[in-house]
UniProtKB/Swiss-Prot annotation:
Record flagged with keyword Metal-binding: yes
MF term (GO), any: magnesium ion binding
The family this protein is said to belong to: Belongs to the dethiobiotin synthetase family.
EC number(s) per entry: 6.3.3.3
Gene coding for it: bioD
Residues binding ATP: S12, V13, G14, K15, T16, I17, D66, N184, R185
Pfam families: AAA_26
Species of the source: Mannheimia succiniciproducens (strain KCTC 0769BP / MBEL55E)
Pathway membership, UniProt: Cofactor biosynthesis; biotin biosynthesis; biotin from 7,8-diaminononanoate: step 1/2
Protein name per UniProt: ATP-dependent dethiobiotin synthetase BioD
GO cellular component, one term: cytosol
């Protein structure tokens, strides 16, 4: 059983797109895998216009784009609730009263259930590495508690080198294996794109797992062929806390 954590250098750097690419690549290699988004936050334009709300769930709206992309990417039959513990309408629930209701035990239980059913589980964080989950945990401290290996998504833009190297430093200081990093081109007009990737490859000890070019609606496309080092993502076994 393999469980690994996907984090990013910032918000809107393409964690979900890279997660889709990884899921598709591993499935193409014959590996059973699902994605899991513990905490999904609000967005300006919901995918569904007809949103149903229920007071009997942990969800404001079951229309978060990231969760829906993960659900669409896997070959397994999973529901929205199977792969998401909390969806909030607000952008930063962990900084509001809503954050007090985020129960880490529920997240742990949901992860354990998935890891017992499927060969591999890709866990996608929200925002960046040190973002709070609630008053007691950050995504980093939670991943460290489970000893999850990490994949870093670097959105190639101005300032990404500083963000990437600081995140790598924090991951290493927490004693977690960095499986590798993925370059996601989010600014097609950025100069020195190749030079940035070359320099980061020299400075980050972990391998470059793939490069995803800028494209229209990547969430609807086959992206698996952009991930070129599947072995790094499947060889480590993770023991989920009981």
């Amino acid at each position: 059983m393999s469980v690994f954590f996907v984090t990013g250098t910032d918000t809107s750097v393409g964690k979900t797109i890279v997660s889709r690419a990884i899921i598709q690549a591993m499935q193409n290699a014959g590996i059973q895998i699902v994605g899991y988004k513990p905490l999904a936050c609000g967005q300006d334009d919901p995918v569904y216009t007809d949103v149903q709300e229920s007071g009997q769930t942990d969800y404001d709206n079951m229309d978060n784009r990231d969760v829906l992309v993960l659900q669409d990417s896997t070959n397994e039959e999973v529901s929205y609730q199977d792969i998401n513990s909390y969806t909030f309408a607000h952008t930063m629930p962990m900084l509001s009263q809503e954050g007090k209701h985020i129960d880490i035990n529920k997240i742990n239980t949901d992860l354990k259930r998935l890891s017992s059913r499927y060969q591999s589980v890709l866990v996608e964080g929200s925002f960046g590495w040190l973002t709070p989950i609630n008053q007691d945990y950050t995504f980093a401290s939670w991943a460290a508690e489970h000893k999850m290996p990490v994949v870093l998504v670097v959105g190639i833009k101005e300032g990404c080198m500083n963000h990437a190297l600081l995140t790598v430093q924090s991951i290493e200081q927490m004693g977690l294996p960095l499986l590798g990093w993925v370059a996601n081109r989010i600014n097609p007009m950025l100069g020195h794109y190749a030079e940035i990737i070359e320099d980061l490859s020299k400075r980050i000890k972990a391998p470059l797992l793939g490069k995803i070019p800028y494209m229209h609606k990547p969430e609807t496309q086959e992206l698996g062929h952009y991930i070129t080092d599947i072995d790094r993502l499947s060889y480590m076994k993770t023991e989920i806390l009981k």
